[in-house]
Structure formats: C-alpha cells, structure tokens
Amino acid sequence: MDYNLALDTALNRLHTEGRYRTFIDIERRKGAFPKAMWRKPDGSEKEITVWCGNDYLGMGQHPVVLGAMHEALDSTGAGSGGTRNISGTTLYHKRLEAELADLHGKEAALVFSSAYIANDATLSTLPQLIPGLVIVSDKLNHASMIEGIRRSGTEKHIFKHNDLDDLRRILTSIGKDRPILVAFESVYSMDGDFGRIEEICDIADEFGALKYIDEVHAVGMYGPRGGGVAERDGLMDRIDIINGTLGKAYGVFGGYIAASSKMCDAVRSYAPGFIFSTSLPPVVAAGAAASVRHLKGDVELREKHQTQARILKMRLKGLGLPIIDHGSHIVPVHVGDPVHCKMISDMLLEHFGIYVQPINFPTVPRGTERLRFTPSPVHDSGMIDHLVKAMDVLWQHCALNRAEVVA
C-alpha cells in the first residue's frame, strides 16, 4: 500500500477543486486590534486589518481581561495541572462556571476545552443517560452537534432548516410517549440567520421534548447582559441546555453548557470529553470570567457592534454586492464559486491589506461559496471605507454580477 499516494490523491483533489485551505500567518498586537502583522511566505511582514476574526467585540485585547489573566498567571502559574476530576479544578474554574450559570439564569454551568467539545460531549452522552432518547436536529446545525449526535448512535431525525412544519411532522411521527431532544442554533454562522427559537420551543413543548440550543455566535452580543438571542427574546427559561463559547465575543478560549444542576452533574459524571480532558489553564478561566462579567454591563459595546455591522451591510449593498442579510452581525457576501472566492481573498490581502478567509465547500454547499466579514466595534469608518472601495475594485476586476441598486 502506497500511503503517500493516497494522501497525495486526497490533497490534489482539494487543489483541483480550488478549496485547498491555506493558513495565513498573522500576529495580533496588543492594543492594536483589528490590526495585525502578516508574515508572508518569504519572511517579510505587512500590516493588515483582520475582517474575519471571531473576537467579535475585541475583548481579547480588553484591559479588564488582560489584567485578570496577568493576576492569575502571577498567582498560579501556567497550566491547571490535571483533569477536572484529578487536581484540575481551581477557584478560577468555579468562579467562571458561576458567572456562566448566572448569565443564562440556570442553576449550573460546565466548562469544556472548547464549544465544539461541549456540543460533541454533551450530545453524544445524553442518549446514554436517557434510554431511548431520540434527537431531532436542524439541518444546518454546526459540525460539532452533528458529530456528537452521530457518535451517540441514537435514533436521529433531521428537520429542514428553520422549517416548523417539518419539525412538527417529525415529532408527530415519533410520538409523545418517547423521550426527545430538539437541537438547534440561535445564530447560524454561515448565513447569519436566526433560529426560530420561540416557535421551536412551542412545538417541542407539545411533545414534552428537551430543548438544546447552540448560542456560540450570540453570547456576549445579544440580550441585555449578553446572554444571547434567547435572553434578548425572553426565552432562556424555556431552553433546557444552552451551549456557548468563550472564544468569540468573550475573546478568550473554551466552551460550556448551562443547564440544571442535575443535568450538568450527569454530563460531568459521564461525558468522556469532559472527564478525560485537561482542564482550562486558570489564567484562561480568569480571563474568561472577567470578560463575561464585564460584558454583562457593557451595553454600549454591543450596540456599537450592531451599528458597525449595519453600516457595512448598507455600504456593500450600495455597490450592488450580493449580501446575505438576515439581521445579525455576520456579513456574508455571496461569490458562488471557489476559484473566484479564493482569488478575491488573496487579492484583498496582497494588494489592500485586508484579511478575509474564503468560505468554501464543505463548510457551505457548492455554488454558495462566500466571503464572510465580521465587523467589530473597533473597525472604524476609515477601515470600512477602505474595505468597501477594495471590494468595488475587485468585484469589477473579476466581472462578478451585481444586483440593481435602487436609488
């Protein structure tokens, strides 16, 4: 068996289809976000503006967060020293979980090494805890949810994205006598559309189903205290399990679930992804807790974030660019093929100092390739002007279609 030949075949297929992924070597600079330094393959450096990061609010640079991390580092050192069960639970972890439980109005929270692991571990474990559990999942749920459900081996059904009639049809076919969990998201990251939380809860409640929501692209950014779209809409108490991240709006690292004390205790006790993973370093837990605590009160930062997203959408729409606008902070621009998508991304970086990663299959379906911009409160008007002008030039250069602009 020629193993290298098999690997070459797989990699060459990606190159041929124009969707081979390259890593851009960048260095974030303290206090300069969204500016960063790009180290080119030849070793030279160029200052760029990051337009595709997940540090949605710039909290990864916030003095409150950095101060908490410096204090914890000086106090405890680098790593946690173990799993949560064996010497790896510290005061910092307990404080963070208390902040998260309070954020979502739940009895408890459980911190994982990432939101991916939190989804995967929880969804793969629940069918072991609840015999006969059937999971009903939105078609566009994140890969971590899909993988967790797959690994559980339980009976599963997929309903059409945000389609309430299809959800009801599936639940009716399962019946009211079986345990059911309905899994969905609040903000779907590739299109930026919102999950139909209230209506899904209404239908799920008719069948006595548990509700599991992924708020990864919403926590910190929506709701009076940053509890997500469910908080914004006054629906947190109707959700049984909330999944979130500490690596996007909160600007640090890690993931979690928030739920009842009994639910968190059961997952803590049975999920291999929690039990056998080294816990977050105390310095990370301290920074995350400080960020969560700060954003509970920083309404102005959230409002500015939404304002910048609206401005960017309006400016790009004014050029006739095909924006996918569902009202969230995510700004996808539809390109429609992987070659042009990567070409525009490369030219933005090389010629304009603008970094946005192309989004290609399998992250999105073929023919829906896009550039996905994530404006933040610290992307100022000059940066927006520069981006809009660059997109205008490159869209014309690539002879891509524009929509008619109504005056």
Curated annotation (Swiss-Prot):
Homodimer. Transmembrane segments: none annotated. One of its GO terms (biological process) is protoporphyrinogen IX biosynthetic process. InterPro entries: 4pyrrol_synth_NH2levulA_synth, Aminotrans_II_pyridoxalP_BS, Aminotransferase_I/II_large, AON_synthase_class-II, PyrdxlP-dep_Trfase, PyrdxlP-dep_Trfase_major, PyrdxlP-dep_Trfase_small. Substrate binds at residues 21, 137, 156, 363. It catalyses: succinyl-CoA + glycine + H(+) = 5-aminolevulinate + CO2 + CoA. The modification N6-(pyridoxal phosphate)lysine is found at residue 248. Pyridoxal 5'-phosphate binds at residues 189, 217, 245, 277-278. The active site is at 248. This is 5-aminolevulinate synthase 1. Belongs to the class-II pyridoxal-phosphate-dependent aminotransferase family. Keywords: Acyltransferase, Heme biosynthesis, Pyridoxal phosphate, Transferase. Pathway: Porphyrin-containing compound metabolism; protoporphyrin-IX biosynthesis; 5-aminolevulinate from glycine: step 1/1. It is an enzyme of class 2 (transferase). It comes from Cereibacter sphaeroides (strain ATCC 17023 / DSM 158 / JCM 6121 / CCUG 31486 / LMG 2827 / NBRC 12203 / NCIMB 8253 / ATH 2.4.1.) (Rhodobacter sphaeroides). One of its GO terms (molecular function) is 5-aminolevulinate synthase activity. Its EC number is 2.3.1.37. Its cofactor is pyridoxal 5'-phosphate.
